[in-house]
Amino acid sequence: MMKRILLAEDDNDMRRFLVKALEKAGYHVTPFDNGASAYDRLREEPFSLLLTDIVMPEMDGIELARRASEIDPDLKIMFITG
């Protein structure tokens, strides 16, 4: 089964780069440009990994990670920043 990554990154260039690199490595990536939208999707379906920027509009990565852990305590979370 293909690993599913939820990506929250507000920088368009970085988001496109990460999607391309991760998909090339065989992952299914669902990208969002803010934490609030990523959180909404996480409430609808499971993911193997949350890859999130820290500073974003609407909901920052720290808050997204906190809320994501409440939904799925086993979800792996990685922070990125640039």
Question: Which functions belong to the PLM regions below?
Answer:
Residues 1-6:
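Non-catalytic signal-transmission and effector/linker regions of two-component phosphorelay proteins
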Residues 9:
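Conserved acidic carboxylate
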Residues 13-24:
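Charged docking surfaces used in two-component/phosphorelay signaling
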Residues 26-33, 41:
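Short hydrophobic/Thr-rich beta-strand motif most characteristic of the beta2 strand and flanking loop
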Residues 45-51:
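Active-site beta3 strand of CheY-like receiver
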Residues 56:
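Receiver (REC) domain active-site loop signature in two-component systems and cognate sites
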